């Protein structure tokens, strides 16, 4: 890499939910019955100095409960590209929904990074409401609380620095404490949006995903994503199958599974 503090970014697809329609992915969907599958990802951010993981995904047990399909558990994909889960120094948790914080105990030596607002939300009075706690798994939340008590959680309030060239930024709406990650690469500043925009169309057409706490905040967060990135083409959504079509695979063996996000798009 030309810059010692530029990073390689890898999107690791570990699962999918094929049986979805547009009504599942957009508020007030126009063609509500048309198929609209989503993929499940975790992301690796690495250079010669460090390896950082964004989100931890979920396991086969959770997949069975939720009717999702898992091809590989995230740590299996990490191992496939030579990354030992125990060697990861930092894990950024975008938010505490089941598909982003479900295998926390697989990373025994990592420091976890979370927004204050997300922990408050996931452990506070909002969880008295069935509709708000639906995307959470209480066991995952309790695991994070235990990590707080063991000194392994760094809390951020709004903007925060993880390492040179890697920062987090609050983008609430889908969840109260959702954060995105801004990463320096040789092609510019890439923003890993996670669920701040599930699909490209959510933010490009400003049409929020229907699991939402605050629609106004979601719309403001779309603007924030674009402001943080070098261009809107540098914003990477959290669940869009198009990501694997718009970026090249790490190598021929990982086609459709592990793709690079720090290089120019293919479209």
Labelled PLM ranges:
Residues 1-53, 58-60, 224, 249, ...:
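Zn-dependent metallo-beta-lactamase
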Residues 14-15, 56-59, 96, 117-118, ...:
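Active-site metal-binding loops of divalent metal-dependent hydrolases
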Residues 68, 72, 76, 180-182, ...:
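Cap/insert and terminal regions of metallo-dependent hydrolase folds
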Residues 68-114:
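Active-site metal-binding motif and surrounding structural segment of the metallo-beta-lactamase
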Residues 91-101, 171-178, 236-242:
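Histidine-centered catalytic micro-motifs
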């Amino acid at each position: 890499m030309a810059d010692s503090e530029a990073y390689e970014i890898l999107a690791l697809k570990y699962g999918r939910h094929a049986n979805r329609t547009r009504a599942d992915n957009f508020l007030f969907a126009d063609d509500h019955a048309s198929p609209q599958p989503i993929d499940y990802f975790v992301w690796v951010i690495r250079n010669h100095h460090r390896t950082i993981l964004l989100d931890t995904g979920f396991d086969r047990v959770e997949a069975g409960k939720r009717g999702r399909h898992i091809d590989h558990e995230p740590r299996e994909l990490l191992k496939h590209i030579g990354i030992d889960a125990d060697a990861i120094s930092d894990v950024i948790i975008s938010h505490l929904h089941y598909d982003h914080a479900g295998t926390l105990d697989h990373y025994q030596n990592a420091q976890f990074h979370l927004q204050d607002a997300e922990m408050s939300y996931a452990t506070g009075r909002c969880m008295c409401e069935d509709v708000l706690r639906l995307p959470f798994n209480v066991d995952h939340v309790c695991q994070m609380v235990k990590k707080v008590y063991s000194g392994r959680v760094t809390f951020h309030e709004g903007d925060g620095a993880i390492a040179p060239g890697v920062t987090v930024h609050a983008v609430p709406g889908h969840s109260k404490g959702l954060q995105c990650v801004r990463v320096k690469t040789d092609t510019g500043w890439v923003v890993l949006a996670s669920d701040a925009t599930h699909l490209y169309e959510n933010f490009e057409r400003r049409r929020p995903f229907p699991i939402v706490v605050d629609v106004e905040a979601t719309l403001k967060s779309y603007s924030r994503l674009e402001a943080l990135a070098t261009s809107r083409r540098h914003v990477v959504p959290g669940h869009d199958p198009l990501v694997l079509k718009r970026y090249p695979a790490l190598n021929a063996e990982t086609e459709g599974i592990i793709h690079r996000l720090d290089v120019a798009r293919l479209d």
